Curated annotation (Swiss-Prot):
The gene is rplX. GO terms for biological process: translation. This is Large ribosomal subunit protein uL24. The keyword rRNA-binding applies. Gene3D superfamilies: 2.30.30.30. Belongs to the universal ribosomal protein uL24 family. GO terms for cellular component: ribonucleoprotein complex; ribosome. GO terms for molecular function: rRNA binding; structural constituent of ribosome. SUPFAM superfamilies: Translation proteins SH3-like domain.
Amino acid sequence: MKIRKGDTVLVISGPDKGAKGKVIEAYPQRDKVLVEGVNRIKKHVANSAPERGAESGGIVTQEAPIHVSNVMVVDSDGNPTRIGYRFDEDGKKIRVSKRNGKDI
């Protein structure tokens, strides 16, 4: 999966189309990413015991994972781009923007 934690992405399809956000977490096995402020859902949480220190029950709004095919990485110019790879002199793999050829 070419999208990693910390990348800024643009949602290209779905109800949140056009929204930009930072990747909070990536799930490569499921091909999904958790994007800050995108795909927010309401989750019903049960009351917890007071000694556990958790918040009491109720309805909590939080982000849900979104499939990687619905997002594109935003490059340094602020444009959505596809990701390619190249190897530097040390043989290390580096991610490259397909739009402008700059390192990501």
